[in-house]
């Protein structure tokens, strides 16, 4: 049996938590998502089910078996397939009326302006170690007055930061500048989750390898990220509810059953953050030494 798609019917169960007129607003919003792997893919599908009608999506990578533990599009049938092709197809299966602009080469300095054209909100789905393009993307969002959300899968939970127009920027919060990638990685971890709820239950620290750009991950964390990020997106796009911008942050850890709200004026320049970074450098040096990297 062939079914005819109807937007109102497809997203009718949103109504109640979302007003009918708000659903129409969401239908005409455009969200940019860079990276369609661990969090990016599930961000796209979750926001599709919220009824967002337009997306700019970017990813240059292909699915591999190492993606099976967490990535929405990773299956036996998609091994070797382009992530952007798989996720675009899945999104169009949810809403065939999507206004979908695809960037199969990923986001680069040369296409960044096109990627952010007509965008109402940017949701970060980039790989943790994609420092250069992440830095450029968030800077471009700040310049254009585009709100941006980063939701990081940490342990078995999520850490979320909102960067809103006219408020603290990504660079002001993390303080990356021209620092080496290893220092950017440390500042990213410490800045994303100042409460550090996840630190006590990592059972095999040797699996954290910043030098080889490999860290452990869980599907639960990615799913939680998508739920929180989509809720923040709803509030930002509809202009209702409380949206706390950086230097405010939020970390929810399902393993511990704990929620922490943080406030770090100055971002990583805050005294508590400076102490955490100093301790982190010592721990990172010891870890890299144990792994034979230094």
Region roles according to the model:
Residues 121-164:
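ADP-ribose/adenylate-binding Rossmann-like module
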Residues 170-224:
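A conserved mid-domain beta-alpha-beta active-site/ligand-binding segment of alpha/beta enzyme cores
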Residues 33-35, 58:
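Conserved N-terminal Rossmann-fold NAD(P)-binding element of oxidoreductases
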Residues 39-40:
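Hydrophobic/small residue at the entry helix of a nucleotide-binding pocket
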Residues 80, 84-121, 125-134:
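A structured beta-alpha segment of the ubiquitous adenosine-cofactor-binding alpha/beta core
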Residues 1-17, 236-294:
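Phosphate-binding loop/pocket of nucleotide- and phosphate-handling active sites
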Residues 165, 224-241:
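Oxidoreductase and adenylate-handling cofactor-binding alpha/beta cores
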């Amino acid at each position: 049996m062939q079914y005819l798609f109807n937007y109102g019917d497809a997203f009718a169960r949103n109504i109640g938590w979302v007003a009918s007129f708000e659903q129409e607003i969401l239908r005409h919003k455009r969200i940019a998502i860079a990276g369609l792997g661990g969090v990016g893919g599930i961000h796209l599908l979750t926001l599709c089910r919220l009824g967002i009608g337009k997306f700019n999506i970017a990813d240059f990578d292909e699915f591999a078996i190492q993606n099976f533990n967490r990535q929405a599009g990773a299956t036996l049938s998609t091994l070797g397939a382009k992530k952007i092709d798989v996720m675009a197809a899945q999104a169009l299966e949810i809403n065939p009326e999507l206004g979908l602009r695809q960037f199969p080469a990923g986001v680069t300095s040369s296409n960044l302006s096109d990627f952010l054209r007509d965008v109402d909100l940017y949701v970060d789905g980039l790989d943790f170690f994609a420092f250069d393009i992440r830095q450029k993307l968030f800077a471009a969002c700040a310049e254009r007055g585009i709100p941006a959300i980063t939701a990081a899968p940490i342990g078995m939970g999520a850490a979320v930061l909102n960067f809103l127009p006219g408020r603290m920027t990504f660079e002001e919060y993390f303080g990356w500048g021209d620092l080496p990638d290893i220092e950017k990685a440390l500042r990213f971890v410490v800045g994303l989750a100042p409460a550090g709820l996840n630190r006590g239950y990592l059972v095999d620290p040797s699996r954290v390898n910043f030098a080889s750009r490999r860290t452990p991950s869980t599907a639960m964390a990615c799913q939680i990220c998508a739920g929180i990020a989509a809720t923040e997106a709803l509030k930002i796009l509809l202009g209702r509810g409380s949206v706390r911008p950086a230097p405010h942050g939020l970390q929810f850890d399902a393993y511990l059953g704990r929620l922490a709200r943080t406030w770090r004026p100055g971002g990583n320049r805050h005294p508590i953050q400076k102490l955490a970074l100093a301790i982190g450098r010592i721990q990172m040096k010891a870890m890299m030494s144990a792994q034979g990297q230094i």
